Amino acid sequence: MNILRRGRLGSNVKEDVMKFTTSLEFDKEIFESDILCDIAHTTMLVEQNVISEENGKKIIAELKKIAKRGMENLDLDPSLDDIHMVIESELIKELGEDVAGRMHTGRSRNDEVATDLRLSLRKKVLEIIGHLITMEKNMLTVSDAHKETLTVGYTHLQQAQPVTFGHQILSHVSAIERDISRFFDTYNRINISPLGCGAMATTGFNLNRKRTKDLLGFYGIIENSMDGVSSRDFIVETMANISMLGTNLSKICEELVVFSSAEFNTIEIANEYTSTSSIMPQKKNPDVAEITRAKLSTLNGELVTVLTIMKALPNTYNRDLQEISPHLWKSVYTLIDSIQMVDGMISTVKVNKERMKENAEKNYSTATELADTLVRECGIAFRMAHGIVGELVKRSIEEKVEIKEIISEVLEKNNLSLSQEKIDTALDPFENVKLRNVIGGPAPEEVERAISSFNEKISAHKDKLDEKISEIKTAEKNLLE
């Protein structure tokens, strides 16, 4: 029976209502966190002389036993609503209500669940960062191997300018760097304690909120009790980060799908990430990239769902907030799985260097450098050079001739001239790449410098990650031993 109902509401509750309102199905994500929260709160109650040391020791010892048993071995009676009441009921079975019933002194499930969510989510955020660091390192390995692999870059999915495949990979590394920074920033806002806020107005008991903050390894406390129990912006922020990262990863999936097609044929996805057709024996379909792309798209929907649940809720706690959790955890696991899939596909991709080079040498990808050369060598305005090269491209297409066959004629018409060496250099795709040696450019030397810079950032990220993981492990060890 739900021990909460025997007073105000009575023991009768409809079974379909119990099943409809229980959160036990997804409370598995906060089970361990709830035990930690209980131990920290009980420890503080003893230190503040709110409950006796004897009772506190009994409660904590039993909580540790429950933790070792695991949630799956508890009586998950849906009439108990949630994991908080399941654990308290287990305590009461073993210790009696006069002892176990003291654990919840000065606390509400409102501040309890808010604390649990933060404890669980901070670990998941660090797990995500760890996967991103691994993927980024692997991508840098691919980039380094292809810093001189000529290919063509696209705008509007139309061939634009020559780059290297290594430079193209770095474009995704650069985006992931920002994703990592966002998650680290969000971690600091997750890792603050609402414990002690009570239902919404704190408590008349002499609690020490700073002590539970320290015991649980939080960086600080939420100082307004109403905000402490009702705020879920840390979840929205995390899910927004997840959605943004998902969008960045979906671009990689799109490139894997498009560039592995026969029409592009610049890369080949490893067999283990593809499938064949049930009817067409020749097919090699990029199924994993496609499914990952689709799963990543659902992250946007999960974010919007949570925002919609939260919109215009009255202050402070409302049971609506319970329905946020399944969307949060689904997003987290979808993202982690997707990161691993993208990492695997990028790490094992086969590159068709000849096809990449062939693409870079056609369709006028060197036109911009030819215009730039006219500006540098002839001293004309770029807009004039742009028009001259545009005319060259137009005539080349219409007359089905190479630019180098008509360039002297067009330049002479405009009272300009270029040496054959300058023309050849301007029209050479790899010379184009080497010329672009500014910060962020595709020149092999610059790509090599960028790889080194990103590796330094990864090292700093890893140190920061290890430090935060160590902080959490220390707090958990101190509470559970």
Swiss-Prot record:
Keywords of the record: Amino-acid biosynthesis, Arginine biosynthesis, Cytoplasm, Lyase
Enzyme Commission numbers on file: 4.3.2.1
A single BP term in Gene Ontology: L-arginine biosynthetic process
Cellular location(s): Cytoplasm
Gene Ontology terms, MF aspect: argininosuccinate lyase activity
Pfam families: ASL_C2 (PF14698), Lyase_1 (PF00206)
Chemical reaction(s) catalysed: 2-(N(omega)-L-arginino)succinate = fumarate + L-arginine
Top-level taxon of origin: Archaea
Gene Ontology CC, one term: cytosol
Main localization of the protein described in the UniProt heading: cytoplasm
Pathway: Amino-acid biosynthesis; L-arginine biosynthesis; L-arginine from L-ornithine and carbamoyl phosphate: step 3/3
PANTHER family the UniProt entry points to: ARGININOSUCCINATE LYASE (PTHR43814:SF1)
Family per record: Belongs to the lyase 1 family. Argininosuccinate lyase subfamily.
NCBIfam families: argH
Protein name: Argininosuccinate lyase
Organism in which the protein naturally occurs: Methanococcus maripaludis (strain DSM 14266 / JCM 13030 / NBRC 101832 / S2 / LL)
Lineage, highest ranks first: Archaea, Methanobacteriati, Methanobacteriota, Methanomada group, Methanococci
